[in-house]
Amino acid sequence: FQWAKRHGLAVEKDNMNEIIIDKPASPGCENVPRVIFQAHMDMVCVCEEGVTYDPMNDPIKVINDGVTLTADGTSLGADDGIGVAMCLYLLQDDTLRHGPIRAIFTTNEEDGMDSMDIDPKYLDGDYLVNLDWETLGSLCNSCAGGDFFNYSHKAEWEKPIVGCKTLTISFSGLLGGHSGVGINKGHANALVSIATLLAMLRQGGVSYCVFS
């Protein structure tokens, strides 16, 4: 918000803390269609095993080897920091000739898609370009969606079985991957793998109880 003010750009913030910045057209390009560029500001905050990291208070330690930016022990935030950086570049570069530009920086994309509730008045452009695609130099003409559901189950508590052995099962070292572009790669999912193992034990006649 303050960055836009310093650059003399019109800026608004809605009740979801989303930032909307407008840059007027270059002289002679006033009648060129308006393009809206959108990127999201939130990120997935994870860290490597053994790393102490509080994303609300600890800064990201960026490693720059001259070619690639990575983070030291944590996620970098390139999703969608790259898109945010692209928007800021377009807004601050006065050497580019362009029509009217609007940049929308949204919040809570990773776990809620709350930006669907943005005021439609901010979407009055001719083109909308989402800067959250996977590959530089390519465009994806499509849309994505998601669904949420709640599941509840009333647990029936039992006393521990006397004389049984206690085991801890953990799955780690998996390849992971993006649930969108990596869902077809056949990588193992830890939750599914544990559930499959428990089902196989039950089918094999192994009696067990699960506790937390």
Place the predicted regions along the sequence by residue.
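Active-site metal-coordination/substrate-binding segment of hydrolases
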Residues: C29-D111, D117, G125-D126, T166
